[in-house]
UniProtKB/Swiss-Prot annotation:
It comes from Homo sapiens (Human). Signal peptide: none annotated. Pfam families: UCR_UQCRX_QCR9 (PF05365). The keyword Transport applies. Component of the ubiquinol-cytochrome c oxidoreductase (cytochrome b-c1 complex, complex III, CIII), a multisubunit enzyme composed of 11 subunits. The complex is composed of 3 respiratory subunits cytochrome b, cytochrome c1 and Rieske protein UQCRFS1, 2 core protein subunits UQCRC1/QCR1 and UQCRC2/QCR2, and 6 low-molecular weight protein subunits UQCRH/QCR6, UQCRB/QCR7, UQCRQ/QCR8, UQCR10/QCR9, UQCR11/QCR10 and subunit 9, the cleavage product of Rieske protein UQCRFS1. The chain crosses the membrane at residues 22-47. Keywords: Electron transport, Membrane, Mitochondrion, Mitochondrion inner membrane, Respiratory chain, Transmembrane, Transmembrane helix, Transport. It comes from the Eukaryota. The lineage of its organism: Eukaryota, Metazoa, Chordata, Craniata, Vertebrata. The keyword Transmembrane helix applies. This is Cytochrome b-c1 complex subunit 9. Residues 2-21 are mitochondrial matrix. Component of the ubiquinol-cytochrome c oxidoreductase, a multisubunit transmembrane complex that is part of the mitochondrial electron transport chain which drives oxidative phosphorylation.
Length: 63
């Protein structure tokens, strides 16, 4: 019974009106994009460890 109540509250809060539905999608997309970009950057950095400028610049900087 609690799941039905939670579902109905979620529906009435976020998905019932078109404006809140659109806002929910836009906010969700923004969070997904941020998480996807950070994940892709982390994978890229891991695959190219030691080859990127940020990993080797300490060898070439003047002290």
């Amino acid at each position: 019974m609690a799941a039905a109540t939670l579902t109905s509250k979620l529906y009435s809060l976020l998905f019932r009106r078109t404006s809140t539905f659109a806002l929910t999608i836009i906010v969700g997309v923004m969070f997904f994009e941020r998480a996807f970009d950070q994940g892709a950057d982390a994978i890229y950095d891991h695959i190219n460890e030691g080859k990127l400028w940020k990993h080797i610049k300490h060898k070439y900087e003047n002290k």
